[in-house]
Structures are given as structure tokens and as C-alpha cells.
Curated annotation (Swiss-Prot):
It comes from Methanothermobacter marburgensis (strain ATCC BAA-927 / DSM 2133 / JCM 14651 / NBRC 100331 / OCM 82 / Marburg). NCBIfam families: PRK07119.1. Optimum temperature is 75 degrees Celsius. InterPro entries: 2-oxoacid_oxidoreductase, PFOR_II, Pyrv_Fd/Flavodoxin_OxRdtase_N, THDP-binding, Transketo_C/PFOR_II. It catalyses: 3-methyl-2-oxobutanoate + 2 oxidized [2Fe-2S]-[ferredoxin] + CoA = 2-methylpropanoyl-CoA + 2 reduced [2Fe-2S]-[ferredoxin] + CO2 + H(+). This is Ketoisovalerate oxidoreductase subunit VorB. Signal peptide: none annotated.
Amino acid sequence: MATQMVKGNTAVIIGAMYAGCDCYFGYPITPASEILHEASRYFPLVGRKFVQAESEEAAINMVYGAAAAGHRVMTASSGPGMSLKQEGISFLAGAELPAVIVDVMRAGPGLGNIGPEQADYNQLVKGGGHGNYRNIVLAPNSVQEMCDLTMDAFELADKYRNPVIILADAVLGQMAEPLRFPERAVEHRPDTSWAVCGSRETMKNLVTSIFLDFDELEEFNFYLQEKYAAVEENEVRYEEYMVEDAEIVLVAYGISSRVAKSAVDTARADGIKVGLLRPITLFPFPSERIRELAEGGCTFISVEMSSGQMREDIKMASGCRDVELVNRMGGNLIELRDILRKIREIAGESND
């Protein structure tokens, strides 16, 4: 198995190509631009389609068209660009079209800056666009997972005919780590049972999100909720670290989870029983596991680079318990000492 030092953004394209992605449509925006650059470099070499669109809106609508034709298709952006894509993502969900969308989060709101943040959580985990839809959301915390979860994203998108979001951040996109390349590539073939491929076989298929009859649209919405319930039942993923006897549990995803893990090790060395729960899927969220830990008397600390958006989901899952927060915003990374200060405060120890 080949191993090479690559950046997180490059790992996304490696995963996409091994997953059989045959179309990429995008628009450059820092800190996600390398994903587009690498797609432009490698996709045409192997006969796959690449277009640098004239805008973020154009890119997401090209994704819609290619997905409707049965292609494995993706795009990527960051912050302001993701806001511009929200209408198109709602249309993808409404038409039940599979697509993979990567968000390399940057600091906001507005133009903000190109530093890392995790403040797109609500926008993408809760939907973001109009209507009653959900995205499946995967949260990598390493360059390896930037590749592996991209591959998984295409499988989930096809399985549920739904947009799948890779929710990364500027650090993960720009950092370089050793990447173990996938063992084998996937050859994707369009699903002619629903796709519109321009053939006699698919000429009666219809891809649309419009329902002029109110009752039909309501019925479709109920159907979508049943689909999302199936996602919640079958696709929850998380990683635990030293939670077996933990009295304090850190909940963190993405790059913040790596700092949180170091905090667990340091606190454990001081005799404090701390563990880490890392959600890998943000939707579906590991609510049941958090409920179990809450019933065992754990105190939760949400560690995130936002105002506390994920903390609300932890509160709900834990039965509306108080959840502590360690956070930074504006492009600042959470530091080890920030987490340790909160742990020691809860444990009743000195911060010295």
C-alpha cells in the first residue's frame, strides 16, 4: 500500500478519484482552492470531467445536472461560497440526487478571514437551505480521513440518494501528513432505475423537486423524514477515547478533537478521569451514546471553534443538562491550556 506525504485538500481529490468520481465542478476560494486545482490537474488526464464554473451558484447547479445524469459528482468551497450554494443543495435534497460537497471551513461571518473555524456547523448539519431536508455530514480529523471519508461519502450519497457534506476546516485542508492510498479504485456506473442518462432505457425517468399538489408534497416530506430516520438508525459513527471510567467527557470533532485528545492524556496523567467522544458523523449525531454517558453521571465539555453550535446538540442528547464550553473564534485555534483550565475547574483543582 503506497504512502505519501500530502495535504488534506489533495487527499480529498485522491479519495474522490478512487471512489469513481467522474465530474468535478467548482469555483476557487481560500482555503479550499487546492481541491479545485488538483481536480483540474488530474481529472482530465484520466478522462473525467472538470469545469471551473463562473460562480459558486453555477458550480452547484452543474453538480445538480451531472448528478441527475447518474454521475458521481462533487464540488468544494468554504464559508461565503457555501452560503451561495445553499439553494442548490436544497434542490439536490429535494430531487433526491447524490452528491458530495466539501466545506473547508474558514472564519466568519461575512468575509471574515482565511483562518480555521467550525462555525458552519448549524448551516450544514441542520440543513442551511429552504425546506425540510438534512445533509449527511462527515467530520474528518486527519489527512487520512480527508481521503477515507470522501470515499465513504460517495457510497452514502448513492445509498440514500442525498447530498453528503465533508465538514473540514482550514487546518485540515492545509496541513500535510502521510496518506495511505486506498487499495483499489471503484468503477462507478449510473443507476438507470432513476437517472436521466439520455438513453431509451431512462427516457421515462423524472428528476424534479416540484410537487404542485399540496398533499403530494406533504407525503414526499414525510417520506424524506423516514429516510433521515433510517440514516440516524444505521449510519452513526463516533470514536471514543478513555471514556470507560470518565467523569468528564470532552466532545469534539475535526481538528479540535486532536487538541482535546492531548488534553485527555495530560489530565489523566494528573489523575483526573477524563475521556473524549469524537463524532465522525455530525448528522446523524451520536445522541444515543451521549444519552448513555449522561445517565452515568458524566459532565460534558463541548470543545469547538464556534460560539457553541454543537453544544446545543449535546444538551439535547444529554436531556438538557448543562454542557460546559471551551471555544475560540475568529480563526484562532483552541489551545491545550484552554481545555485543561476548564477540566481542572470542573474537577475542583487549581489551574496552576
